[in-house]
């Protein structure tokens, strides 16, 4: 479904739908998921095990192009999933997802440019759900193959996806002025 929201705040809509926002920390430089806590210190991302508090990885981004958008990451079996995001109109070598093997210090894949600038992404099995859009540019919700970085499919939206939540077989997508609920 698609519903105009009158330019509402994302948290108002998620509260009304009884959803919790994913990976939101108390500070801009820290966030968490069910298994890990992530903390930015300068240009390094420290990854801690939830529960033990043990630091298991320190990821040093090789250039400013390797940048995680705010409060979002995903780590499974030593593979780190993140994104490079630049604010502004489309340009080459920006706004993409990537998978990085932390054990072997190796980039495994990166998605096409302009496939990610939403505030978060959701991993569901072998699919990464994320979005891209900007003023005077096409706005899409993407399905990206988690193993290859290839775009599986995309859904045109009226505005750029902001926050994405998966719950009870539905995908809730907030944009600047529209809210979407998609059976998944």
Model-derived regions: residue spans:
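A short loop-to-beta-strand structural motif that recurs across blades of beta-propeller domains
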Residues: 44-46, 95-98, 140-142, 178-180
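Eukaryotic tandem repeat interaction scaffolds
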Residues: 59-122
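Short loop/turn segments that connect beta-strands within beta-propeller blades
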Residues: 50-52, 101-104, 145-149, 184
């Amino acid at each position: 479904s698609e519903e105009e929201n009158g330019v509402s705040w994302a948290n108002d809509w998620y509260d009304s739908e009884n959803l919790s926002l994913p990976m939101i920390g108390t500070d801009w430089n820290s966030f968490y998921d069910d298994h890990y806590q992530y903390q930015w210190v300068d240009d390094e991302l420290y990854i801690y095990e939830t529960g033990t508090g043990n630091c298991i990885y320190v990821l040093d981004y090789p250039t400013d192009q390797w940048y995680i958008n705010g409060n979002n990451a995903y780590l499974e079996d030593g593979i780190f999933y993140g994104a490079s995001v630049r604010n502004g109109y489309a340009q080459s070598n920006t706004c993409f997802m990537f998978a990085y093997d932390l054990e072997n210090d190796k980039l495994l894949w990166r998605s096409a440019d302009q496939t990610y600038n939403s505030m978060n992404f959701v991993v569901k099995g072998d699919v990464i759900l994320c979005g891209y859009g900007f003023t005077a540019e096409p706005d899409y919700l993407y399905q990206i193959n988690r193993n290859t970085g290839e775009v599986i499919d995309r859904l045109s939206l009226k505005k750029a996806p902001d926050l994405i939540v998966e719950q009870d077989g539905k995908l809730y997508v907030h944009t600047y002025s529209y809210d979407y609920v998609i059976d998944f």
